[in-house]
Every structure is written in structure tokens, then in C-alpha cells.
Amino acid sequence: MNNLLLVALGGSIGAVFRYLISIFMIQVFGSSFPFGTLLVNVLGSFLMGVIYALGQMSHISPEFKALIGVGLLGALTTFSTFSNETLLLMQEGDWLKAALNVVLNLSLCLFMVYLGQQLVFSRI
């Protein structure tokens, strides 16, 4: 299958997952903090770490990378929404939540990429 079609397929799945997760998180926690965006970014970072490590250990096809790495995870995670939500919190004068959003997204996402890699590498 053409890699472009695989990216589109993965992207459509990732976008639907992001939407459903965001709606669920709003229903559970309300909308005063962007928990949905945080969750999809953290989850996507973990999965990206796993995929990267698997690629280092064995051959992962370009098609799989296009479908999952670029398509699904690219659409699941969202830096632009994170940036917009952080700016909105700042514009509302909620500097603490804005700072918390930045710190949590960056630190948790970096840690989850690392954790995903380590879980795969430790199983060698």
C-alpha cells in the first residue's frame, strides 16, 4: 500500500482517538484544565518511544512507521492544541495552570518516550 495512504489511514484513526479521549477527559474532569491534550501527548510519547526502540532492535517496515509513527501518533498527539490551550490559560490570567500545563506536557512526554524505549530495550 502507498505510504501516503497509510499515513492518511493512521492519521484518521489517531484523530478519532484524540477526539474521543478529549471528550472522555472533559466528562470526567471538566474543562478547567486540558487533561485530554495532556493524556494524548503522554500516551503518544510513550508509544513513540516503544516504536523507536523496536525499530532499533529489529526491522520495522517503512509502511509500519508511516501508518503508526507518522499517521496514528502524529494525529493522536498535538503540539498545536497544547500551545493554544496554554495561551488561552495565560490570556485568562491563569498563569499557574498555564505553567503547570507546560511543565507537565514537556516533562511527562520526555519521560514517557524514555520509559517506552527502556521497556522495549530491557526485554532484549
Swiss-Prot record:
Location relative to the cell: Cell inner membrane
Regulation: Na(+) is not transported, but it plays an essential structural role and its presence is essential for fluoride channel function.
Organism the protein comes from: Shewanella oneidensis (strain ATCC 700550 / JCM 31522 / CIP 106686 / LMG 19005 / NCIMB 14063 / MR-1)
HAMAP family, alphabetized: FluC
Binding site for Na(+): G74, T77
TM segment ranges: 4-24, 35-55, 60-80, 102-122
GO molecular function annotation: fluoride channel activity; fluoride transmembrane transporter activity; metal ion binding
InterPro entries: FluC
Keywords: Cell inner membrane, Cell membrane, Ion channel, Ion transport, Membrane, Metal-binding, Sodium, Transmembrane, Transmembrane helix, Transport
Family per record: Belongs to the fluoride channel Fluc/FEX (TC 1.A.43) family.
Signal peptide (from-to): none
Annotated membrane topology: Multi-pass membrane protein
Top-level division of the source organism's lineage: Bacteria
NCBIfam families: crcB
Job of this protein: Fluoride-specific ion channel. Important for reducing fluoride concentration in the cell, thus reducing its toxicity.
Alphabetical GO biological process terms: cellular detoxification of fluoride; fluoride transmembrane transport
PANTHER family assigned: FLUORIDE EXPORT PROTEIN 1-RELATED
The protein's name: Fluoride-specific ion channel FluC
Reaction(s) catalysed (UniProt annotation): fluoride(in) = fluoride(out)
GO cellular component terms attached to this protein's record: plasma membrane
